[in-house]
């Protein structure tokens, strides 16, 4: 043959389940956040709070802890029951915790900002993320609108990050981690500001159409 070719794998994907895992892990963490905010009181005794920051700290310490545990349980369960074999084991757990904390920061922000309307927005936002994250098929096969919104979807970076830790042994997650740390910081700051507003004026910033 006039041409010599060589084959080199850049990732290790053992089966379809491992290929789909990054997508469904992102969905699982997001749904866990939505379920938590539906059950956990986000405003109880806020009139007694000294400041928005202290009130946020009392709440955030709980929801971050809950999502950290949920992320660890998710990875552990997949490894035990579904034979998930991450190429970067420690980073898989760390990244899952960071993603969970970022998503709960985002979900609680929309919930306290918009109330019941926020819960509906969160559901719509999840559907948009499902289409725009390219979690199942290559982005090039998606419609133009999904290619446009792709860089702005949190699932885009969680799917990419989970793909790296599950299938690529020597790939950095610095970019994805910076994205989610940024989400945590921005959403937390906005949440503190909203709590400050609620302490001074006990009404939602956005009027509720369903009350």
Annotate each PLM feature.
Residues 4-211:
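Membrane-spanning alpha-helical segments of multipass transporters and channels
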């Amino acid at each position: 043959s006039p041409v010599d070719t060589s084959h080199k794998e850049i990732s290790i994907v053992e089966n379809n389940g491992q290929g789909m895992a990054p997508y469904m892990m992102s969905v699982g963490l997001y749904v866990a956040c939505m379920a938590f905010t539906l059950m956990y009181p986000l405003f109880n005794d806020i009139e007694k709070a000294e400041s928005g920051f202290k009130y946020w700290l009392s709440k955030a310490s709980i929801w971050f802890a809950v999502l950290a545990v949920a992320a660890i349980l998710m990875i552990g369960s997949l490894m035990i029951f579904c034979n998930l074999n991450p190429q970067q084991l420690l980073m898989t757990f760390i990244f899952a915790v960071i993603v969970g904390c970022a998503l709960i920061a985002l979900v609680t922000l929309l919930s306290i900002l918009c109330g019941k309307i926020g819960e509906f927005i969160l559901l719509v936002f999840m559907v948009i993320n499902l289409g725009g994250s390219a979690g199942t098929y290559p982005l090039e096969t998606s419609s133009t609108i999904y290619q446009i919104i792709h860089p702005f979807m949190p699932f885009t970076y969680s799917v990419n990050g989970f793909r790296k830790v599950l299938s690529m042994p020597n790939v950095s997650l610095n970019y994805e981690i910076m994205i989610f740390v940024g989400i945590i910081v921005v959403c937390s700051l906005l949440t503190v500001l909203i709590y400050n507003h609620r302490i001074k004026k006990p009404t939602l910033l956005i009027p509720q159409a369903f009350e």
